[in-house]
């Protein structure tokens, strides 16, 4: 889980420059956004559906070809990692994965906190975290799938926030009709 999350944060993060801290590399805004990215990474059939929607909207054949490649390589059967439907959509506790990344100073967790609750959780990818992503695909080429898939998910997501991405995912009937606490079916 940790390496998948690291690649998501790298692909979906925006460059971050902090003159007082040269160790920061990127910022990924929003935990709901992270869960939405993770859902598409773990559910290739839903990602393929979104790719086809984008193809229909833009006419860009690259998106259709990417969707076809997902099915031709049997990804929905081979790469699917189920997620449960929670209050605001697909959810998985990421504490263990994030703890591992945090303990190696690859990711730092911050955000906007109110008096009563956290308004937004943001993830700072350190320069070291960015380097791990770059080096990992060289040292272990099999990890290139995670880098490429996270980049594709980031491209499809664009600048949309977690709420907008979750709304888009809820447009899928099987997703929306999943019982609260149930596993979202393929």
Give residue ranges: language-model regions:
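Short, amphipathic alpha-helical interface elements at domain boundaries
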Residues: 1-76
